[in-house]
Amino acid sequence: MNPLRTLCVMACLLAVAMGNPQSGNRSGRRSNSLDNVEQPSNWVNPREVEELPNLKEVTLKKLQEMSLEEGATLLDKLYHLSQFNHVFKPDYTPEPSQIRGYIVGERGQKIEFNLNTLVEKVKRQQKFGDDEVTIFIQGLPETNTQVQKATRKLVQAYQQRYNLQPYETTDYSNEEQSQRSSSEEQQTQRRKQNGEQDDTKTGDLIVIQLGNAIEDFEQYATLNIERLGEIIGNRLVELTNTVNVPQEIIHLIGSGPAAHVAGVAGRQFTRQTGHKLRRITALDPTKIYGKPEERLTGLARGDADFVDAIHTSAYGMGTSQRLANVDFFPNGPSTGVPGADNVVEATMRATRYFAESVRPGNERNFPSVAASSYQEYKQNKGYGKRGYMGIATDFDLQGDYILQVNSKSPFGRSTPAQKQTGYHQVHQPWRQSSSNQGSRRQ
């Protein structure tokens, strides 16, 4: 029997025995307010706990086959129930040799490495670190088509930004090859025909495929974020010390659980060097299921000079917690975003949005406004400075920002955000929006 299930049944029975009058009440689960977060025993009964699947049976494929609401409900239950007595221990740490990745070479080739050989491979690259260095830590396995596509879009976008050659077509499946003339590429071609100037620069891209070392939900939930972050942080220290890569040009990006790994890596870098990385970007950071006892973990503002986060499934695979200097919530905090049919697609939209903003000419595709709810944004009652989500985010932005996105690519609306009439405040409590469908409590 699932040990989580056994323990949580006992906990729920105890809650019922204590006579909690709100037991079984789910009326608040569609609220996007962060006040008075419900206890698990208030809305999960023992029968439902018994029906939870074994953790090894929960896969990205199964989550992708569920509706957005079904997948989010399952993850909600697993998360809340996991908090009883720290059921999940963060004890899954893939060996550095198991975590593979690649450097994108000048000719578009993949220069493969594992974490043990990363620094040596970088040393062999001419002019590495002369300009920007972007390190993307992928948080979910690329065996999933949604993850694979989002990662490919991000890599292609940086190839354009850094004037690198595209991958050989043999790197992609037939279905992917047929999609190469997507709306994003067509948009770039139209700009070139109109004589618009690309805002490109040189740089280097490293992809760390942490997600490929995660095989099931049990490993996902028990990922040792602290240890993995320390390992990657130490590699960053080696890059600055032995390859002379200045920390001021390093941009660390993490998707899903890797967003928290990136945060720890930033802190480890600071502990070892006394300096901070320039920027960390979190692409739909997840809830943390396995937490070390009596110790804070995961991403937080202060892990780099500037930390920004894009939340596309705040009540699905992601989290509604404010983790960064500026937190962006496309269409407000909710289970998913327009056009996303399941929780996997919803969480990967953050990567797709960021990739779109990286493409030359698209840097300001995602205008946003500081607001405390989607309803407030729609009624032009937001407050403060307008800003852009994505690669062009201003480093002086703070607080919660909301914007509208399209359901299909191009996702950015590219038009100025609505003028707002309120006053600027930082990280205000969420205000409930009755029109914000699919949202739930964390």
Curated annotation (Swiss-Prot):
The modification Phosphoserine is found at residues 31, 33, 82, 173, 178, 181-183. This is Vitellogenin-2. Residues 21-44, 165-200, 408-442 are annotated as: Disordered. It is found in: Secreted. Its main location: secreted. The keyword Signal applies. Disruption phenotype: Viable, even in combination with null mutations in Yp1 and Yp3. It holds the Pfam family Lipase. Disulfide bonds: none annotated. Residues 34-44 have a biased composition (Polar residues). Keywords: Phosphoprotein, Secreted, Signal, Sulfation. It comes from the Eukaryota. Vitellogenin is the major yolk protein of eggs where it is used as a food source during embryogenesis. Vitellogenins and their receptor yl/yolkless are required for maintenance of microtubule plus-end orientation towards the posterior pole of oocytes. Involved in polarized localization of germ plasm components, such as osk mRNA and vas protein, to the oocyte posterior cortex. Receptor-mediated endocytosis by yl/yolkless is crucial for actin reorganization, mediated by osk isoform A/Long, required to anchor germ plasm components to the oocyte cortex. The modification Phosphothreonine is found at residue 170. One of its GO terms (cellular component) is extracellular region.
